[in-house]
Amino acid sequence: MAPPPPAAPPCPGLTELALRVARRIQAGGAPDGNLVFSPLSVYAALALVAAGAGGDTLAELLGVLGAGSRDELAGLAGRLAGRALADRSRAGGPRVSFVSGVWYDKTRTLSPSFRDAAVQSFMAETRAADFREKPGEAVNQINAWARKATNKLIDTVIDGGLPADTDVVVANAVYFKGKWKDPFTKALTKTGKFHRLDGAAVDASFMQRGTYYDTGDYIACHDGFKVLRLPYDDERRRSPASPPPPPSTPRFSLCVFLPDALDGLWDLLDEIASTPGFLQAKLPTRHASVGELKLPKFKLTFSGDIAGVLRGLGLDATFSDGEADFSKMVEDDGGRRPLSMRSLVHKAVIEVNEEGTEAAASAINMVCGMSMTPEPRPVPVDFVADHPFAFFVIEETTGAVVFAGHVLDPSSTAGALDDDDDDDEFVVMGCLRYLLDRCMAFVGV
């Protein structure tokens, strides 16, 4: 039986932001670079920032986030943190960690309304720090929080120091580890050729299913592309007599969008980004009879300041000294200049292998080669990802895009804007996981 249809996105702005940010990051980075990032983390961080914004800055943030008010954003954050991102590892499901924190210089005072929103809606910790006299100690405190919050899986949210005039730091960390519901057999993994956009071919390790293998995988065939959905295990094995889990139980999948043309990725991504509802509408919802299934193992990293990307989406005042309005974040002491956001630093790591990954998935569409009756046997569907493709990790009950990216060369770990060669420390014992951490510094101008 097919699972219940996934819900519409909790806020269309989340999906739209995911697609727009992905295209702008790629446009500003290496043209042949891979990409992984967490739209959900960026969205949640900006939503928390909006809780302390006013005037044109708030209007900009609401416009980019696709929301009508601060209250709407706070409600969305609460639903996601309490439902979609609830940790289900004790029940046999994915291990999820989603945490936020706000640090402010001890000479500042957070406004009560912002503090309440941060704690109650965003479930964030708020702490005073000595950014002026002991900036190194403050950075260590923030990084220690990240390590504790993620069981040492995320080591730092701040690399190096902070600007001397830092007043507020907002940090968020997301971690997801899931095992495939139907794991790949390691013995079937073989080296093959992956065709890059420049026409060159590189060696890659392809995970495979057996020929004509009836799996728990989902494949949808569309004009010019196919979509593969690989569900992650969401619970311990139950006896046949056990009742099914409630519909609200979080479910995650990895969704791979593969163009038919070897060089068709950019056209496909443009179509996804420009057509409202396209992403969810094209996801498969029924099992497929698979002929040949090949997906390369890959590990991607990303590290970079995406403030410029967000400026390009319309956050001009937000990142402009003298124009930003964060008057709702701290109390006015009469002698301090207003706050301005200088940067949004984003880091992400993903590794995919035979055992699992990080997951989120959803949607509905017609699937090729499937039938609800045993006869006639469905025509097997091939899905051979031997050329550039896009991927999305989606939480199905909410439609939230937790992670997104694309693979242009599975033999390379570096992503667009990636400037950090030390991200391997985030991946432990070869387990499949997404790791993401990002921080934002608010500084007085």
Swiss-Prot record:
<comment type="function">
    <text>Probable serine protease inhibitor.</text>
</comment>
<feature type="region of interest" description="RCL">
    <location>
        <begin position="356"/>
        <end position="380"/>
    </location>
</feature>
<keyword id="KW-0722">Serine protease inhibitor</keyword>
<comment type="similarity">
    <text>Belongs to the serpin family.</text>
</comment>
<dbReference type="GO" id="GO:0004867">
    <property type="term" value="F:serine-type endopeptidase inhibitor activity"/>
</dbReference>
<dbReference type="GO" id="GO:0005615">
    <property type="term" value="C:extracellular space"/>
</dbReference>
<dbReference type="InterPro" id="IPR023796">
    <property type="entry name" value="Serpin_dom"/>
</dbReference>
<dbReference type="InterPro" id="IPR042185">
    <property type="entry name" value="Serpin_sf_2"/>
</dbReference>
<protein>
    <recommendedName>
        <fullName>Putative serpin-Z5</fullName>
    </recommendedName>
</protein>
<dbReference type="InterPro" id="IPR000215">
    <property type="entry name" value="Serpin_fam"/>
</dbReference>
<keyword id="KW-0646">Protease inhibitor</keyword>
<dbReference type="Pfam" id="PF00079">
    <property type="entry name" value="Serpin"/>
</dbReference>
<dbReference type="InterPro" id="IPR036186">
    <property type="entry name" value="Serpin_sf"/>
</dbReference>
<feature type="site" description="Reactive bond">
    <location>
        <begin position="370"/>
        <end position="371"/>
    </location>
</feature>
<dbReference type="InterPro" id="IPR042178">
    <property type="entry name" value="Serpin_sf_1"/>
</dbReference>
